[in-house]
Amino acid sequence: MTLRLESLKSNKGARRRKLRKGRGIAAGQGASCGFGMRGQKSRSGRPTRPGFEGGQMPLYRRVPKLKHFPLVNPKQFTVVNVSALNDLKAGSTVSLDSLVKDGIVTSPKHPLKILGNGELKTKLTVQAAAFTASARTKIEAAGGTCELPE
């Protein structure tokens, strides 16, 4: 038997007819159309909105509002871990511009912050807006220095 376009058939049950509700008892979905007896969920129109608890005071209104949330002007940093600095040349000066040039950071939108995840084996002079305590100790233990911009 050759595979021809006119000999193709759908799998059994792949193409089902649309269920037509409310078209008589014999159709299988007549009378209450599968919505049960009475009540809000059997009525036409949209279902209740998310968070609606049937008239009871909903949770999002029972819980108090938090002061100063969300933060109005949160400090945002471009973060780089110490382990990412291992690939750089020893004795070089590391800044946000040099990291963008080397492809470690994609955009210089926010000031640079160095985090202390990983180990540092190369001696570097790192210029950043902020350092974590562990990052500062690891840079200085490798013989490097940490500099804050003016």
Swiss-Prot record:
Record's compositionally biased regions (Basic residues): 12-23
> Region Disordered: which residues?
1-57
Q: Which GO terms describe its molecular function?
A: rRNA binding; structural constituent of ribosome
Pfam families, alphabetized: Ribosomal_L27A
Q: Which domain of life is it from?
A: Bacteria
Q: Where is the composition biased (Gly residues)?
A: 25-37
User: What UniProt keywords are attached to this protein's entry?
Assistant: Ribonucleoprotein, Ribosomal protein, RNA-binding, rRNA-binding
Q: Sorted alphabetically, which InterPro entries does this protein's record hold?
A: Ribosomal_uL15, Ribosomal_uL15/eL18, Ribosomal_uL15/eL18_sf, Ribosomal_uL15_bac-type, Ribosomal_uL15_CS
Q: Which GO terms describe its cellular component?
A: cytosolic large ribosomal subunit
A biological process from GO: translation
Assembly state and interactors?
Part of the 50S ribosomal subunit.
* Function according to Swiss-Prot or TrEMBL: Binds to the 23S rRNA.
NCBIfam families assigned to the protein according to its UniProt record, in alphabetical order:
rplO_bact
Q: What is this protein called?
A: Large ribosomal subunit protein uL15
- Recorded source organism is Synechococcus sp. (strain WH7803)
Q: What does the record give as the organism's lineage?
A: Bacteria, Bacillati, Cyanobacteriota, Cyanophyceae, Synechococcales
